[in-house]
């Protein structure tokens, strides 16, 4: 089975990145699941509640730590929404 481009590229990079934990991989996978899929590096809306449920992350602190580290490591671009009724924006980076 051929994987979709962003997730395949992420898994290749993640296999060599010792900084990533299973929670990072699970969170990225949940973002990929909720991404529109047509344009790999476009921004799309995500909600913390949905991502935490799908990735099985129970702690809000762990969620924010993983988001912050995925941004710092260059795997995603994240634009938080400080409005509780609006979803945040995220883009899965496709840099090699």
Predicted features and spans:
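Generic structural signal for short, solvent-exposed loop/turn connectors between secondary structure elements
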Residues: 1, 95-96
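Short recognition helix of helix-turn-helix/winged-helix DNA-binding domains
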Residues: 1-54, 85
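Winged helix-turn-helix DNA-binding recognition segment
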Residues: 35-94
